[in-house]
Structure formats: C-alpha cells, structure tokens
Amino acid sequence: MKRVILTPNPYRDKGFRTVLAAQKILQDAGLETRICLPFDVDKNFDLPKDIRFARLDRELQHADCVICFGGDGTILHMAKAATRHRIPILGVNIGTMGFIAELESSELEDLRKLATGEFSLDSRLMLDVTVRRDRDVIFHDIALNDAAITKGAVARIVHLNVCCDGVQAMEFGGDGLIVSTPTGSTGYSLSAGGPIVEPDTRNILITPICAHNVDSRCIIASDKRTVTVQLASSARRNAFLSVDGGKAFKLNMGDVATVCCSRLETKLIRLKGRSFYDVVNNKFRKHND
C-alpha cells in the first residue's frame, strides 16, 4: 500500500478537519495521499483554498485504496468507481449509523496499519441492475446495497409482479420493492421489515415495502437467481427505480427490471477484526441512546 485517495463528503466533514487529520497520519506513516471530492458540490459551496483537490478519475488509475469520509451514502457512491478499478475501499464514519464504515472519526490512528500491511479484505457481493424496454437496454448500474422500485411521491400504491428465474414469486400492491445484497440488509430493506443478514453470505433479498397483501413477505433467494420486476397488468401508474439511493429512473408499463449477482465484488478494508454482531449491537445501541 503506497498511494491512497481520500474522499471526504464536504457536507459531513465540516471544514475538512477529519480528512486533513487523516492525511497527516498517513503521510507520517510514509504513504502518498491525494484528496478528491467524491461528487460535485453546489455552486454556492465554498471550498477551502488551502486544500489542493486532485481529479478523482485520474487518481483512480494509480491508487492502491480509497478512504471515504462520511456516512454509508458516501461509501456507496464511491464503491462503484473503486470497484470498477479493482481498488479496495475503507470507510470512516462521519454519519449516523455507518454500518459499512470500518472506523469512527475518533479512530484515525488505526489508519497507520495501512502502511504496515496490518489489514484484511472483505469481499462483498454486488448486484447487476438493468432495465429493458422492448429489446433495448435503457438502464444499467451496479449496487453494493440495493435496488429499490417505488411509487414515487404519488399517494396511490404501485402494483408489481416479481419473478425468480422466470417463475412468479409474488404479485402485490404496496409502496414498492427492495432487492438488496446482504450488505444492504441493514439499510432500506431493514426499514421495510427485512431481516439482518451476515454481509459475507451470498444471497439476494427481496423485500416488499408496505405490501397490502398479508402473504407478501421478504424472500431470501440464492445469489444464483435472476430477479425480474415489472409493473403488474393492474398497475395504474409508473414506478421509479433507484440504485443505492441514486437518482430515480422512471419505469413504464412493459419495462422489465432485472437484478442478478454481479461479476464485480466490492473489496472493503478491515483494520479492527470486529465481529459483525458487535457492529450491529454497537450501531443500534449508539443510535438508540
């Protein structure tokens, strides 16, 4: 490990204090660092003039790892680019729950372990998400957490038909559906009543959101399944697809959303060696205090 990209969420890391502290620790340990913004900021946002921001797309060509500073959303945003470049990522939580993050902002000294090789890598399953309209692929993305198909802002329910390997698994009316990875089981899926699943297992979770059918429950499918979702014939309105909380994509009647296990896997850097159950217990206890 020689070259590290630091990607702070400028709306979370006030004054960039956390990323600058981390940069000093890493440089003192002999590592080369670059600070890059993970996304474009608002035009009215004042970036400090004394920090030199490098271009993320260029730095990804040469980096050995990416450290994300923010909440899980920041990590999810960076996971796609890092994974496509086969670069592992490490999360430093400056958010609320932060299930994916390895460190809290008070644990920055542990970053020195990157220089000495005292870390391990976790492989996390990702989802491949496509939408076909007639014969054309009109949308494609990858997800570390989930793909959510929802009714949007309208008050009426959305009617969905869900199949696994071409066989109908459920048809229901409700607020929508979440197809998630085990990593995503502690995110939106959990809020919709889905189970907590160990993140290193290989499953696909199918979780209805506020289903009006009492028999529509979360399904834990094999990672070998292909899940297809369409608006049911009884549907009156469009639906919207969002991957890892990203920008919503409109689904029309006849569109087919397909979700399956991706060939790509996100590599998460582990420094602490903590049990997943310790993480779950600590996060929920901290959030409820």
Where is each model-derived feature located?
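ATP/NTP phosphate-donor binding region
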Residues: M1-C65, S106-D122, V131-D141
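Catalytic core of DAGKc-family lipid kinases
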Residues: M97-D175
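Redox-cofactor binding/interface segments in oxidoreductases and associated redox assembly factors
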Residues: L6, C68, V179
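Short glycine-rich anion-binding loops that position phosphate/pyrophosphate groups of nucleotides
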Residues: Y11, D72-T74, M97, T183-S185
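Gly/Ser/Thr-rich active-site loops/lids in small-molecule metabolic enzymes
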Residues: M170-D215
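Short, acidic/small-residue loops that bind anionic groups at enzyme active sites
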Residues: H85-L103
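Short glycine/serine/threonine-rich phosphate/pyrophosphate-binding segments
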Residues: G15-F16, G73-M78, T186-S191
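ATP/nucleoside-binding phosphotransfer catalytic cores, i.e., glycine-rich phosphate-binding loops
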Residues: I149, D165-Q168, R217-D289
